[in-house]
Amino acid sequence: RICYLAPRDTQICAPGQEICYLKSWDDGSGSIKGKRLEFGCAATCPTVKPGIDIKCCSTDKCNPHPKLA
C-alpha cells in the first residue's frame, strides 16, 4: 500500500499495513491554519479520542490533504 505521510509525500507502507488514514482535529489555538492533520499507514483503522476525526481507506494514495485532493 502507498499512503500519504505528509501533504505531498508518500511512502510504501510496511507489510501488513494495508490501511491509509487521515486524522484531523482542532488544536484549540484558534489558529488561522485550521485543523491539525496526521497522515499514515496502519494494519487497522486507528481508534481515536472524541474530537478527532479520522478517515480510513484501503487503496493507494487515498488519504490526500483535503485541500490538495
Curated annotation (Swiss-Prot):
Pfam families: Toxin_cobra-type. Keywords: Acetylcholine receptor inhibiting toxin, Disulfide bond, Ion channel impairing toxin, Neurotoxin, Postsynaptic neurotoxin, Secreted, Toxin. GO terms for cellular component: extracellular region. PROSITE patterns: SNAKE_TOXIN (PS00272). It is found in: Secreted. One of its GO terms (molecular function) is toxin activity. Expressed by the venom gland. Disulfide bonds join C3-C20, C13-C41, C45-C56, C57-C62. Binds with high affinity to muscular nicotinic acetylcholine receptors (nAChRs), whereas it binds with a low affinity to neuronal alpha-7/CHRNA7 nAChRs. This is Alpha-elapitoxin-Lc2c.
